[in-house]
Structures are given as structure tokens and as C-alpha cells.
């Protein structure tokens, strides 16, 4: 597998609609305001977080069960900033909608700006032929409330191209998160 460059990412976004909306350069400021960067980087794409969040609360449940998840465990928040309570987490989604090619696996890594503040971003790989908004998981590992900024960079996508297409893609197997929009909760 080879990692794909900024040139390839731009071409795939333009010709195949791989990333929409797409920002062709790295954005670090808006007017005089400094931002957490987003857009194309040398070997990846820095995604933005939309302004829709689900913040975890333990009011309705004593146990977190991925097979029987209680939607009431989240409080919906919409805004330019989301505050995650200490030692808690929140879900969000990318501004960008992705369409992953059949011969590509996409890996997501958190941005150092957040990691150095104790905020961890987790996303499972975007599999071949998966498409949708990416659900982002933010963990606040600190003992203080933590801020997440909407419409700014939160994670970087790395695109790995295989030397041959897979036999069965995510789309072929009817993956449960195919075509997801908005913040998507766990499914079994």
C-alpha cells in the first residue's frame, strides 16, 4: 500500500467527488483569526468538525452497552464550540462527505493541537467504497472541561492505495454505516 499525495487527493476530489466540500489548500487563518488548520496537506486531508455534537451523560444508564446503547445517554448541542465534561466524551461529524474508492483504505489520526491538550480523536478506518459523513469520537482525558471548535480542523485523513482492489468492499457487504449523514450512534 502506498500513501497518496496532495496531488492525488486534489485530483480525486475534483474528478471523483471523493471529498465534498473540498478545500484545495491548508487554511490556518480567517481574516486575523487563527484557526486549527484544515484542508489539503502534503500527504493527507485535515477535516473539519461540523457544529452538531452529542455530549455523553450518565444520567439514564449505569453501564455503556454497545449492543444496546441508550440514545438518551447523549445531550444534543449545536454551536460554534462544544464543551466536553472532564473524563467524558462527545460525538460529532465531519463537515466533509467522503466517497472512498474501491482500492483505497483511509486512516484517521487526531491533530496534535488537540492531543497536546488531552483531547483524543478516534475514528475507525474508512473502508473501500464506504461513503458518508465521518462520525468523530472526542475523548476528554483531562480533569477539566475541554473545548472543541466547529468548522476548524480536528483530524487528518491519510489515503492508502492498495496494489489491487479488494474482493468485497464495504458497499458490497452492505455495511451498516454506509451513506450515513449527521452524527451516527452505534449500531449492531
From Swiss-Prot:
- Which pathway, metabolic or otherwise, does it act in? Pyrimidine metabolism; dUMP biosynthesis; dUMP from dCTP (dUTP route): step 1/2
Question: Does the record carry Transferase as a key word?
Answer: no
Q: What are the protein's GO molecular function terms?
A: dCTP deaminase activity; nucleotide binding
Q: Does the keyword Hydrolase apply?
A: yes
Give the UniProt keywords, A-Z.
Answer: Hydrolase, Nucleotide metabolism, Nucleotide-binding
Spell out the PANTHER family in the cross-references.
DCTP DEAMINASE
Q: What is the recorded name of this protein?
A: dCTP deaminase
Instruction: Give the organism the record lists.
Output: Azotobacter vinelandii (strain DJ / ATCC BAA-1303)
Give the classification, highest ranks.
Answer: Bacteria, Pseudomonadati, Pseudomonadota, Gammaproteobacteria, Pseudomonadales
Amino acid at each position: 500500500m502506498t500513501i497518496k499525495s496532495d496531488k492525488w487527493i486534489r485530483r480525486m476530489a475534483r474528478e471523483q467527488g471523493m471529498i465534498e466540500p473540498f478545500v484545495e489548500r491548508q487554511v490556518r487563518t480567517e481574516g486575523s483569526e487563527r484557526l486549527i488548520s484544515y484542508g489539503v496537506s502534503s500527504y493527507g486531508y485535515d477535516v473539519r468538525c461540523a457544529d452538531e455534537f452529542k455530549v455523553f451523560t450518565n444520567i439514564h444508564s449505569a453501564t455503556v452497552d454497545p449492543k444496546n446503547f441508550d440514545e438518551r445517554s447523549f445531550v444534543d448541542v449545536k454551536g460554534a464550540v462544544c464543551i466536553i465534561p472532564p473524563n467524558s466524551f462527545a460525538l460529532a461529524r465531519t463537515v466533509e462527505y467522503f466517497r472512498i474508492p474501491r482500492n483505497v483504505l483511509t486512516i484517521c489520526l487526531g491533530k496534535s493541537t488537540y492531543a497536546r491538550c488531552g483531547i483524543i480523536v478516534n475514528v475507525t478506518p474508512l473502508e473501500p467504497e464506504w461513503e458518508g459523513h465521518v462520525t468523530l469520537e472526542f475523548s476528554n482525558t483531562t480533569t477539566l472541561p475541554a473545548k472543541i471548535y466547529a468548522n476548524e480542523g480536528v483530524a487528518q485523513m491519510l489515503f492508502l492505495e492498495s496494489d489491487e482492489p479488494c474482493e468485497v468492499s464495504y458497499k458490497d457487504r452492505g455495511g451498516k454505516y454506509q451513506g450515513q449523514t449527521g452524527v451516527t450512534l452505534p449500531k449492531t
